[in-house]
Amino acid sequence: VSGWQSPACEACRLGLHAETYVMTLACPRRCFFCFNPNQADFDGRAAGPRDVVRQLEARARSGAHLRHVALTGGEPLLHPDEAVAFFERAWELFPGVHSRLYTSGAGLDGALLTRLRGAGLSEIRFSVKTDEGAVAIEEVLALIGEAVGVIPDVMVEMPVMSDELGFMKELLVRLDRMGVRGVNLLELGFPLFNGEEFVRRDLKLKGEPYRVLYDYAYAAGLPVAGSEEACLALLRFAREEGLSIGVHYCSMENKHTGQVYRQ
């Protein structure tokens, strides 16, 4: 970690009083590294939306005392009214809860940002898709800039490709100037499918393929070579440049360990 770290990241490591809810696995993006199609019930959840408000209410009735909740997908903002209702209900059921939203920015505008803030949203995490071209990147950066000053903590969360170190350094500097609170750098993972896209990009596994000896509720994958080194280089860069933005590295091992605790 370099600088600020989201309290949600700290809670995620042990899964204490923290839960993430999936409204839908449907998404307008087609990221080659996406884990979601590897979910056991992907076909059944792709359309959505799931009744995440009812799930929250069930957890409250069971005696849960949640301090961190998140809404993810897919793209939760394909269903904006339901997303707002989720955060409103989370605040009612668990006063003071830290809430966060994961989004590509699809369907987001100033009016929806204001509604989300009014519903109690604490943190929003945007993904920047480096392979979608300059125009798409500028569009999401504009949304990120609009979110700064509306949502208390604005973040970017994205996997790091080993050959995009230069781009990522420029992005960190730009996000820092925009007033973005933090960046969560993810170790790129192979999602156990879509292998032809990884071959086309000359991406290789970090180690020899191995059988995952755990029944993960969230089907993750195997780490890709070079991504961790690039993430660590970006951490050093942020410190050496004195950037104010918080930079956090989340390895595939960290994701797996956190899930073991949660399950």
Q: Where is each model-derived feature located?
A:
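Core AdoMet radical
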Residues: 38-50, 63-79, 93-108, 119-140, ...
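Distinct, well-ordered alpha-helical segments
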Residues: 81-88, 109-117, 136-140, 168-171, ...
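Radical SAM enzyme core and accessory elements
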Residues: 1-3, 263
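Conserved C-terminal portion of the radical SAM core fold
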Residues: 139-258
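Short, charged beta->alpha transition segments
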Residues: 52-60, 110-113, 140-144
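N-terminal, charged/glycine-rich beta-strand/loop interface patches
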Residues: 56-60, 83, 90
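Non-catalytic positions within long, well-ordered alpha-helices that form the structural scaffold/packing
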Residues: 60-62, 117, 176
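Canonical Radical SAM [4Fe-4S] cluster-binding loop centered on the CxxxCxxC motif
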Residues: 4-50
